[in-house]
């Protein structure tokens, strides 16, 4: 059985944007996961969210298109969200009260459950509150 981590859009955005406050952490976290033999799988929605965030919120269209081209080239391991994941994500989302946590975060969480992933590649503390493990910060 493979060792798995599920990637969130914020991890991917941090890797792509050298000015992101989590850029160095993202580099270290992804290197740590890969060196430990983990595969990082992204829900297809996380790829879409990262592309949108880079283009719209961060005004980095070149980075958005870079991620898109990498997706097209098959550079990412992708888990396409099925009905079960989406339904469970909608149930998890109903329990959230913070406006910072979106349905996309719930999809990442439920993808991690579905795949029995050990880690989530993200910097969002909400996942810790939901009982998931993030990559250790002291690596």
Predicted regions and their residues:
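Active-site neighborhoods of divalent-metal-dependent phosphate/nucleic-acid chemistry enzymes
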Residues: 78-118
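Short beta-strand scaffold positions
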Residues: 7, 41-42, 80, 103, ...
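Short, well-structured N-terminal submotif of metal-dependent ribonuclease cores
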Residues: 1-42, 56-66, 139
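A generic structural signal for short hydrophobic patches within well-formed alpha-helices
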Residues: 12, 47, 127-128
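Short active-site oxyanion
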Residues: 36-40, 75-77, 116-118
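Acidic, PIN/NYN-like endoribonuclease modules and their adjacent C-terminal/linker elements
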Residues: 1-4, 109-110, 114-139
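Helix-adjacent hinge/juxtasegments
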Residues: 52-79
């Amino acid at each position: 059985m493979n060792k798995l981590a599920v990637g969130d859009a914020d991890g991917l955005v941090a890797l792509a944007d050298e000015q992101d406050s989590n850029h160095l952490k993202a580099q270290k976290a992804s290197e740590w996961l890969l060196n430990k033999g983990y595969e990082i799988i992204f829900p297809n929605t996380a790829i879409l969210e990262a592309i949108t965030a880079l283009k719209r919120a961060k005004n980095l269209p070149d980075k958005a298109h870079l991620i898109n081209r990498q997706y097209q080239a098959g550079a990412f391991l992708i888990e396409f969200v099925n009905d079960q994941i989406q339904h469970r994500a909608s149930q998890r989302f109903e329990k959230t009260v913070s406006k910072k946590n979106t349905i996309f975060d719930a999809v990442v969480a439920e993808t991690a459950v579905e795949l029995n992933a050990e880690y989530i590649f993200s910097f969002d503390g909400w996942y810790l509150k939901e009982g998931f493990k993030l990559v250790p910060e002291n690596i």
